[in-house]
Structure formats: structure tokens, C-alpha cells
Design a protein with these regions (language model features):
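Asp-based, Mg2+/Mn2+-dependent phosphohydrolase catalytic module
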Residues: 2-32, 129-228
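Active-site neighborhood of HAD-like aspartate-dependent phosphohydrolases
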Residues: 3-66, 70, 81, 85-88, ...
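Hydrophobic residues in well-ordered beta-strands that form the structural core
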Residues: 40, 124-126, 201
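Short amphipathic alpha-helical segments and helix-helix/interface helices
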Residues: 46, 108-113, 189, 212
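A structural motif shared across PLP-dependent enzymes of the aminotransferase-like
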Residues: 72-76
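Membrane-interface interhelical linkers
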Residues: 88-89, 222
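Short, acidic loop-to-helix structural element flanking the phosphoryl-transfer center
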Residues: 93-123, 162
Length: 228
């Protein structure tokens, strides 16, 4: 696969924020969101959609995205339908470029590698349409980063549906309380907690240095006998 010129090797790793070994905690799997966590997106989605097609377009895309995220239709099909319904003089192929934006965070990717080295099963837990999944794999180089790829379009269900989390737990071979889920969406975090997962609500685009501290702290707390 062809990769774009995005370096995923950190130039300067923050010193000595140690990841506890998996053997020292009850956590066996770490599930990480992509947008806002492993990759930086800059302009929030709602704002970007509004800029690209107007407020009505943005709302229609948000309201109608479920089937595309669950892989039951393509993003192109959704865009074509919304453009037609709203009578917009825009081309779906041009609008599709809005989904071709994200910059991998080298420090976040290094955290994934360190988690794997420490014995955790790492899971890419991300809502994506078929087209953006292909772009992330081919241009950003996501294949092989995590042990398990949990793209919603391939699973047939998307966050915040409980079935999405249950499917990832099955793939990872762990119980809910053995999994730590990191996401920038409060809705997704609440849904994961309902299923019983441990969670970290990471601020969108806050960067890999903070992410590393959050994950290390959560794993250390999980290892404490006084937890809960």
C-alpha cells in the first residue's frame, strides 16, 4: 500500500512515563479511537461539514450517517443522496475530500507500540465509512498498528451501540472489566461504561503526551488493590 509522507515515529518521546506491564493489572486490552485520539483532525467535524456544504448539509450528514458507518452503504452514496435531497450544486466526489484529512500523532502511535510490548492487546476502535477506512489504511498506514482493527463499517455496527463494544470484546477475547476504552466523545464513553468497560474521556486532539499520561495512570489505578 502507498503511504503518504506522515511520520509516525516520534522525534522526542516524553521521558519515562512507564506503561505498567499487562501482567500487573486486570486490564488485558486497550481500545483506542482514531479521530481526536490516535490522529489529529483540527477542525471539528460539525464545523468542517458546515463549511463544506452549509448548515443543512452538515445536519443531514450527521442525522443520516448511521448506515454508512455501519457499512450498509458507502459514504459516496450518502453524499449523493444528501446533495440531491437538498438540491445542492455540489459534487459528492468533491465533498468526499473532507474525509481525507487527519494527521497521525507520532506519540500516540508510539504509545500503541509500547502497550503491545507491555503485553496488552491493542484494538483500533473507530467509526469509519468504507472510503475513509481505505484512505486511513492506504495513506496513513494503519494496517498493523493495532492487534485488532475495529472499523465500524467492517463490523456492521457503530459506536455508541452496545453491540459495537460487545463485538470488540469478543474479538479481543476479554471481559468488559478487562478492557480500557479511550475516546474523545462523551456519548461513546457513556455507552462503553454501560457495557462495563473502563474508560478514558480524552480531550479531542489533545495529543499523545497527555494520552500516554492518561493511559499509564488508568492502568496503574487498575492495578491497585484498593480500586473501586
Amino acid at each position: 500500500m502507498t503511504r503518504a509522507a506522515h511520520s509516525t515515529e516520534p522525534e522526542d518521546l516524553p521521558e519515562a512515563i512507564v506503561i505498567p506491564p499487562a501482567s500487573s493489572t486486570p486490564v488485558r486490552a486497550v481500545l483506542l479511537d482514531a479521530d481526536g485520539v490516535l490522529q489529529l483532525i483540527g477542525t471539528p467535524w460539525g464545523e468542517a461539514l458546515t463549511r463544506g456544504g452549509g448548515p443543512a448539509f452538515a445536519q443531514a450528514m450527521i442525522d443520516g450517517e448511521t448506515d454508512a458507518l455501519a457499512g450498509r452503504e458507502t459514504l459516496t452514496e450518502l453524499l449523493e443522496r444528501v446533495v440531491k435531497d437538498l438540491g445542492l450544486e455540489l459534487r459528492a466526489s468533491d465533498l468526499l475530500e473532507m474525509w481525507h484529512r487527519a494527521t497521525p500523532d507520532p506519540l500516540a502511535w508510539q504509545l500503541v507500540r509500547d502497550l503491545r510490548e507491555a503485553g496488552y492487546t491493542t484494538v483500533l476502535a473507530t467509526n469509519q465509512q468504507w472510503e475513509r477506512r481505505a484512505w486511513m489504511r492506504e495513506q496513513l498506514g494503519y494496517d498493523g498498528l493495532c492487534d485488532i482493527d475495529g472499523y465500524s463499517c467492517t463490523l456492521g455496527v457503530a459506536k455508541p451501540d452496545a453491540a459495537y463494544f460487545q463485538r470488540l470484546l469478543e474479538l479481543a477475547g476479554v471481559e468488559a472489566d478487562q478492557a480500557l476504552f479511550v475516546d474523545d466523545s462523551a456519548t461513546n464513553i457513556a455507552a462503553a461504561r454501560e457495557v462495563g468497560l473502563r474508560t478514558i474521556h480524552h480531550p479531542a486532539d489533545a495529543g499523545g503526551e497527555l494520552l500516554r499520561r492518561e493511559v499509564a495512570q488508568a492502568l496503574t489505578l487498575a492495578a491497585s488493590p484498593s480500586r473501586g
